């Protein structure tokens, strides 16, 4: 039986924001980004796409929970013409036993959890939190404060599936290189700059990136 994940004693997370992505909207390209002072979790209520977090790439579908560790680069893209339907929650003060502050999971356990038998609970909790966060009344704030810890613990304790299996090292590195370029696109980057940031030699970096993407980092930029 897997070890249960619990909060550090006396440490309860707080909701910073709740947003709902409407499926009817046309799919848009979002900038790769990270959050240095808080974390996020998303519930996919409709659609399919891809989630990349910390360089690890996962196909995602309805009923998935997307976990994010504070400080990691991440992005969600739809595989259809329309936006993937998600409920997104920004969370501060997350402290789970055995994990660094702001971390939902260890990378080797993957960043996606299928809701499976808990899908009805996940849907209901996510919708309730979003709706009450939108109301912004004192009693709604209290409801959110009570429901959010339940959603977080339920999500963190869901078992990973086969998508959490080891991913090719070079694929993870190529994703991290691409994400680094994406967050520094306004700068005049050189291979040496990227190599220094990734702790890799420029030659090795360029070789891996071309092997995975079919183009050099310079052409990608």
Language model features: what each stretch is:
Residues 176, 180-182, 187-221:
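Basic/polar phosphate-binding segments, predominantly the helix-turn-helix DNA-binding elements
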Residues 102-162:
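Amphipathic alpha-helical segments enriched in hydrophobic/aromatic residues interleaved with Lys/Arg
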Residues 164-172, 216-221:
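Short, Lys/Arg-enriched anionic-surface-contact patches
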Residues 52, 97-100, 208, 220:
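Residues that scaffold the ATP/ADP-binding catalytic core of kinase and kinase-like folds
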Residues 71-95:
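Ligand-binding loop in jelly-roll beta-barrel domains
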Residues 1-65, 72, 80, 103-105, ...:
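Generic protein-terminus/edge-of-domain signal
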Residues 139-142, 167-174, 186-187:
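Cytosolic nucleotide-utilizing catalytic cores of signal-transduction proteins
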């Amino acid at each position: 039986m897997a070890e249960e994940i619990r909060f550090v004693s006396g440490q309860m997370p707080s909701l910073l924001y709740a947003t709902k992505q409407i499926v009817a909207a046309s799919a848009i390209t979002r900038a790769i980004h990270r959050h240095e002072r808080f974390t996020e979790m998303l519930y996919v209520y409709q659609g399919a796409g891809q989630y990349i977090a910390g360089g690890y790439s996962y196909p995602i579908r309805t009923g998935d929970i997307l976990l994010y560790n504070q400080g990691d680069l991440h992005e969600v893209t739809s595989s259809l013409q329309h936006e993937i339907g998600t409920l997104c929650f920004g969370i501060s003060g997350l402290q789970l036993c055995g994990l660094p502050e702001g971390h939902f999971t260890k990378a080797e356990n993957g960043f996606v959890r299928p809701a499976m038998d808990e899908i009805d609970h996940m849907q209901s909790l996510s919708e309730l939190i979003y709706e009450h966060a939108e109301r912004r009344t004192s009693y709604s704030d209290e409801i959110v404060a009570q429901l959010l810890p339940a959603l977080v613990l339920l999500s963190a304790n869901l078992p990973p599936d086969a998508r959490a299996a080891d991913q090719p090292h070079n694929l993870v590195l190529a994703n991290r290189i691409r994400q680094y370029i994406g967050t520094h696109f306004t700068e005049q980057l050189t291979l040496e700059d990227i190599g220094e940031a990734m702790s890799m030699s420029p030659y090795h970096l360029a070789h891996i990136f071309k092997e995975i993407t079919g183009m050099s980092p310079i052409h990608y930029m």
